[in-house]
Amino acid sequence: MDAVAVVYGITAAGFAVGVAIVGYLYASLEGSEERSILAALALIPGFAGISYVAMAFGIGTVTIGETTLVGFRYLDWVVTTPLLVGFVGYAAGASRRAIFGVMVADALMILTGVGAVVADGTLKWVLFGVSTVFHVSLFAYLYLVFPRSVPDDPQRIGLFSLLKNHIGLLWIAYPLVWLAGPEGLGLATYVGVSITYAFLDLLAKVPYVYFFYARRQVFATKLLRDSGEVTATPAD
């Protein structure tokens, strides 16, 4: 087993920790009306973990011309990254329309990115440009659209800001890695880019679900407020 496969295996194990965190979150929110919605967070580390197991065994990885397309990497991204930005919108209290919009923009960013990987010449850079437009639109949602929906609750504001900045900072890194890699300008090797993506994926998803667990009082407090049992509590 080569170094990349070993890293993929370690990354998959890391995602198992993320699934466990969501399990603890679910158990801690018994009675909350948001419990079933937040259970869907398990799809983020869960699907990513399955994808990395497949990647470790070379499943779905194909060579197109001189390009290696790691199919499960992009399948993982098209499933999990819309959930990442969608749950930021959910934490902000955004409308379903806004949440759906940001998820679609994210999925289109990934799909056009896949096209840029397998295309050649001018078409490659046209598709990369289109993907970049969708990428920029995500920042518009995170920093312009969603903040207008956040309720005047210090705990909810704190959670939203944490998630928004976590995703925002990491989303800057991904296109830079792509540009540096073999699919872009060829400044970095396939091995280096693969390991970097694994690190970024783990960093993006496991701490993300932990933030929901660490700030779970946001959702528990909402339940108690609705029942009239407590008054507002200060943010952590």
UniProtKB/Swiss-Prot annotation:
List of residues that carry N6-(retinylidene)lysine: K205
Location in or out of the cell: Cell membrane
InterPro entries in UniProt: Arc/bac/fun_rhodopsins, Rhodopsin_retinal_BS
GO CC field: plasma membrane
Positions in the Extracellular compartment: 1-3, 57-70, 119-122, 182-189
Alphabetically ordered keywords of this record: Cell membrane, Chromophore, Membrane, Photoreceptor protein, Receptor, Retinal protein, Sensory transduction, Transmembrane, Transmembrane helix
GO terms for biological process, alphabetical: phototransduction
Membership in a protein family: Belongs to the archaeal/bacterial/fungal opsin family.
Protein name, UniProt field: Bacterial rhodopsin CSR3
